[in-house]
Amino acid sequence: FQMLEGPVCTEWVNRHKFYKATMLSKTHTKYIQSLLHKKFRDEYNLFIAEGPKIVMDLLESRKFACKEIFALPGWVTGNTKRVSILTKTPVTTVVDFELEKISTLTTPHHVMAVFEKGKEDTAIKTTGKITLVLDTIQDPGNLGTIIRIADWFGITDIICSEGCADMYNPKVVQSTMGS
């Protein structure tokens, strides 16, 4: 099962142990699927991100530690060097049907990654800057859109009440694309 062609690519991949081609076990698949639920995202302190733009943005931001990356062979081939510079996390190459099993999307993107949640800052310092306070925004898509728009306006501090959707919900993460 050869992912990359040519002696230079093969040698580089072997030297850096960048990817591994493997079938996901049932247990591992269930574990990733469990991260779709808030209870397990909180328990494991992890969340998932899907799609090339979101995954690369999160890797480049270096705000969240990447734990696992799952990608189709074509994505691995085109992003080997860039990803290896951003993270030491190996990329697991999966086939279409495996990505469909673990994806929240009806048409999965080429890559999905598991990241550690950020630390919540409970100390509210509002002096000299705009802080956005959200109360009972229950729709994940709306919350993600609000976060993306707030980022565009330069708002860096957002406080969500208990009644808001989970900010690590896959739909929220998807809706914040680019911010």
Language-model features and meaning:
Residues 91-114:
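Glycine/small-residue-rich loop that forms an oxyanion/phosphate-binding "nest" at active or ligand-binding sites
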Residues 78-88:
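Short, aromatic/basic amphipathic alpha-helical patches
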Residues 124-179:
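RNA substrate-binding interface of SAM-dependent RNA methyltransferases
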Residues 106-126, 157, 164:
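Acidic/glycine-rich phosphate/pyrophosphate-binding loops and surrounding catalytic core
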